[in-house]
Amino acid sequence: MQVILLDKVANLGGLGEQVNVKAGYARNYLVPQGKAVPATKKNVEYFEERRAELEAKLAETQAAAEARAAKINELGIVTIPSKAGDEGKLFGSIGTRDIADAITAAGINVSKSEVRLPNGVLRTTGDHDVSIQVHSEVFASLNVVIVPEA
């Protein structure tokens, strides 16, 4: 199925590109999320009229994402208390939701889907580097310190 992308989509393309995708991916994900429209003659003409407006909107969201990333980088360190054993092993684990909640409590809104844990959930006390994907091209890094609860 041919679609016109209205936003940058990872591993697919950027704004305005006409790409071939499977019908289910287009119907169930791209179109409902507002990331694409079917590539009919009418939609192609409509898109060409609105191209500048959509590019400006995309640049605006990118700038907002970079501002959020700068705030997260400024924050630098987030401390999360958790129950742990004697050797520094946690009872349970710290996942994306816990990290997102801690960053939100520090004053910057972050959803759990934006948190990237390269080595899976955190199971030990100490310092851990975590990256936050604020936008498809904008990343921020953060140091998460897990301390044992008293």
From Swiss-Prot:
Binds to the 23S rRNA. Gene3D superfamilies: Ribosomal protein L9, C-terminal domain, Ribosomal protein L9, N-terminal domain. The keyword Ribonucleoprotein applies. One of its GO terms (molecular function) is structural constituent of ribosome. GO terms for biological process: translation. The keyword rRNA-binding applies. Pfam families: Ribosomal_L9_C, Ribosomal_L9_N. Signal peptide: none annotated. Belongs to the bacterial ribosomal protein bL9 family. This is Large ribosomal subunit protein bL9. Keywords: Ribonucleoprotein, Ribosomal protein, RNA-binding, rRNA-binding. One of its GO terms (cellular component) is ribosome. SUPFAM superfamilies: L9 N-domain-like, Ribosomal protein L9 C-domain.
